[in-house]
Design a protein with these regions (language model features):
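Glycine- and Gly-Pro-enriched alpha-helical subdomains that act as flexible
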Residues: 125-148
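Conserved alpha/beta cores of soluble small-molecule-handling proteins
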Residues: 1-123, 149, 158-228
Length: 228
């Protein structure tokens, strides 16, 4: 029996009234991550009437579906706490794998402290969020995302919004999201299945951004009316 990160692969989809948002993109990511982890993807048959946050998981028992009620306001102004990023081998990093309890524990601790999200740090840089992908807008109109080689999970929500962000005149660039970039950010948007397009307004009790929400508005419009 396989244990550890290669024991399972999963993705979490937003569902309302049996409609799973951007399911095709989620299944594509599931297949990519499964290939990295050495997990064979069987035929997936989606049950009817799913509602909430739906985790689709593949392990040695086959395909399973786990639902959780929506528990956070969509597109919120979020308060975050920095937390050291969990680390695995370079090959494992960036996948939604079977050793995810470290992330779940971080989420639980952050919510118990009254915050909304964890911002994950490694080597003095923002790598990812516990359930979101951070986008940092600087004063030159560049939207910075963490270099994929640093270990962040590729985001389906970002894939949905990317075209609209570029069409709005923003330049997307990968790099190291260091403390200086965060401190001088014009706006930080957090994209994720559960939070939609949230705006980070406080991090470790320090105000973030200049109060503008132009990038957030672009992302909210890209996600559409279903994200409510």
């Amino acid at each position: 029996m396989v244990i550890g990160p290669k024991s399972a692969v999963f993705t979490t989809v937003r569902a309302r009234g049996g409609s799973l948002f951007h399911l095709d993109l989620h299944l594509q990511r599931l297949a990519r991550h499964a290939a990295v982890l050495g997990i064979e993807v069987p035929e997936i048959s989606i049950p009817e009437g799913l509602e909430g946050l739906i985790r689709i998981q593949i392990d040695n028992g086959g395909v399973s579906f786990h639902s959780k009620e929506f528990y956070q306001e969509i597109h919120m102004d979020a308060e975050g706490i920095t937390v050291p990023a969990p680390r695995w081998s370079r090959k494992i990093m960036g996948t939604k794998h079977g050793d995810w309890d470290a992330y779940r524990q971080i989420t639980s601790e952050v919510l118990n402290k009254g915050a909304d999200v964890a911002i994950l740090i490694h080597d003095y840089c923002v790598i990812d969020g516990d359930r979101v992908m951070p986008l940092i807008l600087d004063n030159d109109g560049v939207v910075w995302i963490s270099d994929s080689k640093l270990g962040g999970v590729d985001s389906v929500t970002f894939d949905v919004c990317k075209g609209a962000i570029e069409d709005s005149g923003f330049i997307i660039s990968e790099g190291r999201l260091n403390e200086r970039l965060v401190a001088r950010a014009k706006e930080i948007v957090l994209l994720g299945t559960g939070m939609g397009a949230a705006r980070l307004t406080v991090l470790d009790d320090i105000d973030i951004g200049d109060g503008s929400d132009n990038l957030q508005k672009v992302c909210i419009e890209a996600l559409g009316d279903d994200w409510r």
